[in-house]
Amino acid sequence: MIKFSSFIKSNNFDLFIFLPIVFLIIIGVFGIFSISMRIDEKYDLLIKKHIIFCLLGLVIIIVCSKLSIKNLIIFSIIFFVFSILLSISTIFFFPETKGASRWVKLFNFSFQPTEILKPTFIILSSLLLGRYYSKKDFSFILNISLFGLISLILLSQPDFGMFILFFSVWIIQILNSSLEKKIIFPIIFLFLLSFIMSYIFLDHVKFRIDNFLFSNIGDNYQINKSLESFSNGGLFGQGIGNGMVSKNLPDAHSDFIYALIGEEFGFITAFLILAFYIIIYVRIFIISQITNNLFILNSLTGLGNILIFQTIINISSSLNLLPTKGMTLPFISYGGSSIISSSLIIGFILTLINNAKKQ
């Protein structure tokens, strides 16, 4: 225990963020272990891959938390460009999965490059917004252009849920930057127009929204099973491997992992998960308010928002409060791309917090 505490202190980790992340990872490992018990031929592979990605995620958090602001920006630029190129390649060169072209597939490895765009774009957007605020140059046009490129990629794949996530975080960054209303209102109008056009022309978007608003029991099998699992779980759950979610839901390891936890681990564990996410978000918000550096403020706000918004979308989908988006629960759902992206977000947050405290 002494060694662990000295390790935390020597790395300047913020315990209000790092410890909840560790707890979320542990809960996720138990959840994936439960699912892997149901898959005889992939029992060892599924849980082993998940544990490997979790360990890799912790390494990423530690390494990124040591970056200077300068190196953080350089790192983000390099990986943003790399992820953009890979994301474009998924549309033209890689086969579709469930009607979408989001994955780079090499041998037995699949990777979703748009996941890396989340933390890196937030850093670049914060940098450009800070520059525009002080110099009133072309940087805001470049910011809009980068977001427009990401939007085009996401809607082409198509990944409307990710588009909503990006836009929500980006527009809050802009509002935080105190830009003129004549700039903000046209952007909001373009978003509403994009939403309407997506509903009209993108069949998968129309299907999910219609299914959410007008579906009956037969149309909403996964959601009904998800809701049923929460009522079955009670306070303490039915025990690892004793639930029905992993048997009946093909996406129990990703989209509906929260439903599995609610059934097998109970309401108390499901509530603790929410509490951990809230603690992380509140801590990020508190630190962001003590800095006078616009770049750090926008970066912390954006990274915190994208993490909590993704959490809200996943959990709300499980509870039928939002249409299903195919979005993972950070640090809990199975998926290497998601774990790496979430780890980058937390690593970036920790290094930004360290710099904010030094001011």
Description of each model-found segment:
Residues 97, 101-103, 183-273, 295:
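Hydrophobic, glycine- and aromatic-enriched re-entrant/interface helices and adjoining loop segments
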Residues 88, 152, 171-172, 308, ...:
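Hydrophobic residues within the alpha-helical transmembrane core of Major Facilitator Superfamily
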Residues 2-24, 30-157, 220, 315-330, ...:
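Membrane-helix boundary/helix-loop-helix interface segments in multi-pass membrane proteins
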Residues 52-56, 60, 264-281, 345:
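Hydrophobic alpha-helical transmembrane segments
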Residues 77-84, 136-156, 160-200:
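Hydrophobic alpha-helical segments of polytopic membrane proteins
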Residues 129, 167-183, 245-269, 328-345:
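Interfacial segments of multi-pass membrane proteins
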Residues 288-326, 332:
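Loop-to-helix entry and N-terminal half of a specific, functionally important transmembrane alpha helix
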